[in-house]
Amino acid sequence: SSFGYSQAVVGTWEQYKRETNNKLATRARFKDSVDFIGWYVNKTSKLLKIPKGDAYKQYLAYYKGWGDYKNYKKDKKAIIYAKSVKDLANTYRKQLTICQKNLNKNKYIIF
């Protein structure tokens, strides 16, 4: 069953630990969960050819799993969640663009 910050299932978590040689990783540790998500997104990009920046499809692959991803169109709830994730990702992307523009301004004078 899924557990921890990443809601990772046991089998996939064990695969992550083997492939990353991170034998002491635990689903209850935030740092490990974040690393797991990065590993999963990277692997999803390679296995299913889903771009890392495609929040909609990446979410569906995470929610359904690699094996059942192809059937996501039958899962209306997953599609609703994925649209919400996509919208949130777009909001964050816009905010990051604004932040970057503000950080690039030379508004501080160093003497």
Predicted feature residues:
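Short, solvent-exposed mixed-charge patches
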Residues: 110-111
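Catalytic and substrate-binding regions of cell-wall glycan-acting enzymes that process beta-1,4-linked
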Residues: 53-107
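Alpha-helical segment that forms one wall of the substrate-binding/catalytic cleft
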Residues: 3-57, 61-70
